[in-house]
Amino acid sequence: MNQRSYNIFFHLHTISGIIISAALFVIFFAGSFAFFRDEIANWQKNKEMPAIETGITINIDTVLDSLNNTYQLYGRDIEIGKHYNERRIDVNLSASKDSTASEESKKGAFFYLDTNTFHTYNYQESYTLGEFLYRLHFFAQIPYPYGYYLSGFVAFFFLFALITGILIHWDKIVTNFYVFRPKAKLKTIWTDAHTALGLIGFPFQFVYAVTGAFFMLSAIMAAPNIFFLYDGDQQKMYEELEYTEKPEALSYEKLKTIPSVEKYVTNTKATWEDFSISHIHIHNFGDKDMKVSVEGELNKKEKFTGNGKIVYQVSTNKILSKRNPFTETTYLDGVKNVLYRLHFGDYSGYSLKIISFLLGLISCFVIISGVLIWLVARDKRHIPEKKRKFNKWLVTIYIAICLSMYPTTALSFIAVKIFPFADKAFIYQFYFICWLILSIIFICKQSLYSINRYALLIGSIIGFFIPISNGIITGNWFWKSYSENLFQSFFIDIFWLVLASITLLVSFKIRKNQYKTFNSSKTS
């Protein structure tokens, strides 16, 4: 590569990276914890689920009987789904299509149903710390759609930074990978770490940049298609992409008896081996034109993209359509499922989740080291003092905001365990207020050494108290959880003990003289 091209790619890499650095750190840090969303949710609620996802297992007839006691179901479309490995399933009731129905029946409803107690919860009540961290990694807390678009554009620029980063290191990609000079000057140490760990994490980061941009910017990309290909009919496009189903008209002829829906679920599950049910759609409940659609997927070890579906006509007990997950996976199914599987990392058990978590933290380190390289490169005598001070203040703010996430997250685990009725409002207020306070404290310290060391140290100390708080409040000490096969509770406790031990060790390894480059001003 000639020098001119190298300089262009280098500056593009630097500019694109520094612009998105803080937002990108939040995405990777929160996203790393989001791999364990279900485990965190069940640990918080003290409700154990099998480590292996089994889909919907509750008797659907029992669910419908329970719903019918509260809601008039005739003429409604009912969707029952299970998206996460929790005890709760989500239930979506459409407004009744019966024009003679009561005003109450003409209102839709969405809630979560506990499959053990049959208690219902709205979204705010069902909110967990796992859900919060999952949604934080694509900025869902920012009003829709701005948070989604922000995370999508961050992912897009991250993809740009990845490609330019590989290009500028291309000529020495092998030799530089093996170079690490711990006794060299600070910029060299950061550069070696940034290069080596960046190359290790490149495939992981590339996958998440592509899939993240796709998920978050798909609405923008879809807009021209809706206008030109579907004449502005958004519903039609979603139907063809199989995100929604075509509405069925009501015949206004009530069935004398409602047949068992569970038998259709059982029949579908028995049709294919290792098939778990994920969604049940009931159209026109109680009507002559009532249809039941049962969807699910094969065990991911059996087939990576094995989605199956059977649609039944209730009045005749006939199968209207059938999609074999072994032989009839469409191109559309393949694309959607591959992108989802790659992004969520849910196709190979805990080993893949742990590896993905570690790669996510490595990505956080790559981001931090990149910012510090940028600072050291601009801390030169020929650069005006005002610019140098501004650069140091900027990086101090960046690092303070990023690293204060660790103790904030650890403290939030204890908070949701101490306050068992913590809902969405509580988690929002606690997390963001703690994050703000810690960020301000670290910024006021004006010391990169103090921020790095004490963020890790405080986070580690709090992290050690997480399994202790769980043991005191619930009685599920990790050794007891292990002996009673409460795997998710055991996993989260051990997870924090290991993570806190590692970060505590790292905090003790940080030395003040490593930051002597910054001693020329208050931000040293």
Language-model segments: which ranges?
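Extended, hydrophilic extramembrane loops/domains of integral membrane proteins
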Residues: 98-138, 163, 300-341, 365-372
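Alpha-helical transmembrane segments and their membrane-interface junctions
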Residues: 206-221, 405-428
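Juxtamembrane interface at the cytosolic side of transmembrane helices
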Residues: 2-4, 8-11, 152-199, 357-404, ...
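Generic alpha-helical transmembrane segments
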Residues: 401-414, 424-443, 458-466
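Juxtamembrane extramembrane loops of integral membrane proteins
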Residues: 3, 23-29, 33-134, 138
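Membrane-proximal low-complexity regions enriched in glycine and acidic/polar residues
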Residues: 38-80, 235-293, 299-304, 315-324, ...
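Generic detector of multi-pass transmembrane helix bundles and their immediately adjacent loops
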Residues: 436-524
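Internal alpha-helical transmembrane segments
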Residues: 1-40, 145-233
